[in-house]
């Protein structure tokens, strides 16, 4: 009986050992966008002065970026920069960053995605209607690519009375902008 128990114990021990090499975890790849205004780092709700002397305060900055990749290697289909909610963070993804010494993307929602049914995108996609919310106009015009809102002082003087609201909602396929980033240094 002891012999059977010993054999079963040794058998269990040898089969429980994992001889496969542990999988190397992929690095967390993170893309940040840092907006600037007139060469200054952009901060929401700060007051800036235009070249003409007008004071302006931005209260909303949102924009879509799509089709991140490098040649035929796709990285990320779509991301929404919501500067008030997430700051400069555009997206994080577990990926081998060495595949991306350069990166291309589209500022806006690429025409291959812009006119699709927004409810058909996966729930976690920023293009899904429940996530896009007011950033989607409708099926014919598609998504708002960039939403910039704020307040401005219409009298160029020493006052900082930013009391006139403005809103720019930019979209439609005409305003797509291709982006290319070369010689990327991914920080550790």
Report each predicted region and the residues it spans:
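A short, solvent-exposed, low-complexity linear motif enriched for acidic/polar residues
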Residues: 18-188
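Positively charged n-region of N-terminal signal peptides that target proteins for export
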Residues: 1-4, 18-19
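C-terminal motif of bacterial Sec signal peptides marking the signal peptidase cleavage site
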Residues: 13-16
């Amino acid at each position: 009986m002891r012999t059977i128990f010993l054999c079963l114990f040794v058998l269990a021990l040898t089969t429980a050992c994992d001889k496969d090499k542990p999988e190397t975890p992929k690095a967390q790849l993170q893309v940040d966008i840092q907006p600037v205004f007139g060469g200054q780092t952009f901060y929401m709700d700060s007051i800036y002065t235009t070249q003409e002397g007008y004071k302006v305060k931005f209260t909303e900055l949102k924009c879509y970026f799509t089709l991140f990749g490098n040649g035929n290697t796709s990285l990320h289909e779509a991301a929404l920069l919501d500067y008030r909610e997430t700051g400069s963070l555009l997206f994080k993804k577990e990926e081998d960053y060495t595949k991306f010494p350069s990166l291309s993307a589209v500022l806006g929602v690429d025409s291959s995605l812009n006119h699709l049914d927004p409810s058909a995108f996966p729930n976690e996609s920023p293009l899904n209607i429940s996530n896009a919310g007011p950033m989607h106009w409708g099926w014919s015009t598609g998504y708002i690519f960039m939403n910039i809102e704020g307040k401005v002082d219409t009298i160029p003087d020493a006052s900082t009375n930013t009391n006139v609201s403005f809103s720019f909602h930019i979209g439609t396929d005409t305003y797509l902008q291709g982006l290319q980033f070369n010689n990327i240094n991914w920080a550790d």
